[in-house]
Structure formats: structure tokens, C-alpha cells
Amino acid sequence: MKYTKQEARKRRHYRVRSKVSGTAAKPRLNVFKSNTNFYAQIIDDTTGTTLVSASSLNLGLKSGNIEAAKKVAEEIAKLAIAKSIVDVVFDRGGYLYHGKVKAFAEAARENGLKF
């Protein structure tokens, strides 16, 4: 039985999440992409709280393309640095490091986040 793309992504995400977790000193930068939007959160897994979040919905962008991912990365980096969060652990959410996810990661690094 072949897994669908969504099932394969969820399996990858569960496997990665068993190894990756964020702390207060180095929180987890999580990404999620839907068909129309791109979302990112910085999460402290020890307390289970979201420290910073940004999405293409909040920015008023009409699509979830590569340019939207870059703008979300700029916004989340700006918000994180304002809360003195610089070092993070990148959780790509089971997605392949390609396209929107890669553009997001590179833009976040360019704007001051370290991972």
C-alpha cells in the first residue's frame, strides 16, 4: 500500500519530532504550508507555548508562494529578534527542504536567525 503525500509528510514529521524539540534557550522554528498560505511559529516545547508566530494571512498576502514564504521569514525574524530570540532549531514539518521551505529558511537566516 502506497502512502499519499500527506501521509508520507506526517510520518516524516513524527519521525523528526521524536528527535527535535525546542527549549527556552533554543526554541523550535516550525513551518506549515497549506495550498494557499504559509505559516511559521517559534515554539518552546518545554512549556508548550508559542513565542512568536507569523503567516501569509497576517501579512495580507494573497498566495502562499515562494515570495510569501520569504516575507513570512522576514516578519518572524523581526519579531523573534525583538523578543531577543536568535538561536532556533529548524523544524521543516516533514516537508522536503526545497522550494518554499528552502526559500523560507534562507530568508530567515539572512534576517538574523541562526540555525
Swiss-Prot record:
CDD domains: Ribosomal_L18_L5e
GO molecular function: 5S rRNA binding; structural constituent of ribosome
GO cellular component terms listed in the entry, alphabetical order: cytoplasm; ribonucleoprotein complex; ribosome
BP terms from Gene Ontology: translation
UniProt entry tagged with the keyword Mitochondrion: no
One Pfam assignment: Ribosomal_L18p
Segments of this protein annotated with the region Disordered: 1-20
Start-end of Basic residues biased regions: 8-18
Domain of life: Bacteria
Keywords: Ribonucleoprotein, Ribosomal protein, RNA-binding, rRNA-binding
Function: This is one of the proteins that bind and probably mediate the attachment of the 5S RNA into the large ribosomal subunit, where it forms part of the central protuberance.
Family that this chain belongs to: Belongs to the universal ribosomal protein uL18 family.
Subunit structure: Part of the 50S ribosomal subunit; part of the 5S rRNA/L5/L18/L25 subcomplex. Contacts the 5S and 23S rRNAs.
Full protein name: Large ribosomal subunit protein uL18
Organism from which the protein derives: Mesoplasma florum (strain ATCC 33453 / NBRC 100688 / NCTC 11704 / L1)
